Amino acid sequence: MAIHVIQSQRIEVLLQEMLRAGHQPSANPFEALKTQHFIVPSAAVQAWLTVRLSEHQGISANRLFHQRIRAFQWFAYQAVLDNKEKVRKANIPRMIIKWRTYQVLKAFLQAAENPLALDHPLHSIIQRIYDSASRLSSGTEQQLKKQGMLYWVSEQVSRLFSNYMEYRGHCFKQHAAGQACDCSSNWLKDWGQNQPLDLDQQFFSMQTAFPGLDSKEQLAQQRQVSDFAKDQAEKLEQWQRWLWHREFHADFELMQGIDDDFWAIMDHPETRAAALAKLPKQVTLFTVLDLPPSQLAFLRRLGQYIDVLILHFNPSQEYWADTVDANWKKQYDVKLKQRFKDKHPQASDQEIEAFFEKYTLEYGQMKESRHPLLTRFGKQARDHFSLLVNLAAGENGEEWEDQFPADYQDHLLGKVQYDILNLAEPEQGSFAFNEQDDSVRIHVCHSALRQLEVLKDQLTYWLSQGSGERPRSP
């Protein structure tokens, strides 16, 4: 039992690997009747997989799809733990967070003016809702405007708190038994105790982007901007902390208790066998849209007891977890050289270049930008890769497999894909352009509606063409 990661730049290769993994020989003929479990990033991928599996196998049945890792996580809790009602209540979807936030804040919006004192944690957010309707003369219009603003705020809070529960509510260090978590990223632990975050340490420690080059005036300006941003951040932190501590902390503690109960059963030798009988022997993660470290840690721990197959879409076979946006690096380099010229007006070009090479090496800013399309539009995929690449060491028995076919068609799109695969920076004039090459098309549209119309026309054209293997029948 372990985690097996297969990565490829082609979705069809990942599909074939999934089919191969689902046809492992078994001595028990009834294994074929058991439900197969798949974790997919969206309903669209689920529909695509269902169609492709039907094409390859003639039928798609007895398969259970889970929308993202979180859904499978709560499925496992529900299957293993006996108190089903407790598990059901502990799982709080975003819709519940939104309406509970709406009800809490609504009580402070009934008066004609903000009823809260200036030192109340909610004063800033309630005042913002009142200000949104301050220019309206009609009382009815003001009330409708405040309700609309309150609904928008509640929607944003539900997004924030859902992300906090995934990214800001867990301890990622190995602590001794009984030792409290001191992770700076574990915000919800501090908020649960109604303790404010150390914003100075996390965000406003005055770490200049160009050490040793900023003048006194530039440092003073940065400090002034930092003070304003800090004041705004403190107001945000105050009302979010108050709302979390009052309304959602107890629910989050219950969620963490559910996780503790689950692993207590899985880790105990006497209860493990009965729990494993309620779980699938294998779960397949088909590509990822988001990958919170806490959910990856759940899969790694679960991989000690069942097979976890991760099919990861990776456009490049090279290591690119440390790449940066090419535009960002260019702007940074230009600003760096300009700061040096401002401080040393008489410096020659050779002195500027010598300083630039020494400075970038000394402060660790010599990062590669590599292929601009990948580094600019693939930041989230880069972060996912940097998390998954930790599994390549196989410390807990994880297996890693690369499937990167290098055959590409001889057109412009194939050239771009090949460069991204090998993380090669594009060179001007490296590809002979063919006027008949329509692999990449650029349409300039005057509105979003026109974009949809062009997209519809193109999809209709592509669907009407068919292929060599499956020609379109009139």
Regions found by a protein language model. Give the residues of each.
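Nucleic acid-machinery interaction/catalytic patches
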Residues: 1-474
